[in-house]
From Swiss-Prot:
InterPro entries for this protein: NusB-like_sf, NusB_fam, NusB_RsmB_TIM44
HAMAP family listed in its UniProt record: NusB
Protein source organism: Streptococcus thermophilus (strain ATCC BAA-250 / LMG 18311)
GO terms for biological process, alphabetical: DNA-templated transcription termination; transcription antitermination
Name by which UniProt lists this protein: Transcription antitermination protein NusB
Amino acid sequence: MTNIFKDSRRDLRERAFQTLFALEFGGEALDQAYFAYTYDKPIDEETEVDLPSFLLSLVTGVREELPQLDSQIEEKLKEGWSLSRLIMTDRTLLRLGLYEITSFEETPGRVAINEIIEIAKKYSDKTSAKFINGVLSQFVTDEA
């Protein structure tokens, strides 16, 4: 049975993750976001779909701030580790989580982290979820 997302912020974060992950392989951001948003929705080719602004903000924001996000994440990794050493899923989730923590003041940092952890549990494993929690928590602690 197909899971039709309800456009909650949690669902849109997951769609943003799917979009950003797909963009690692190439393509246009808007095309990838459209696909991630609509692939499991019962729509026909003639239906015009407006992508939610939260989804677009996450995707475009991460893409625009990628070098800064990567630099900030690299600073928090243990010695001997780099972003290139991480699996693509974890790298994408760290970028998405950090972007929301630093750019969406209306979202408490801990909420953003918990949401990313739930996505990590679905698309990665418990070890990755703990790792992502550990890295992103450093940004929330630093801001407090």
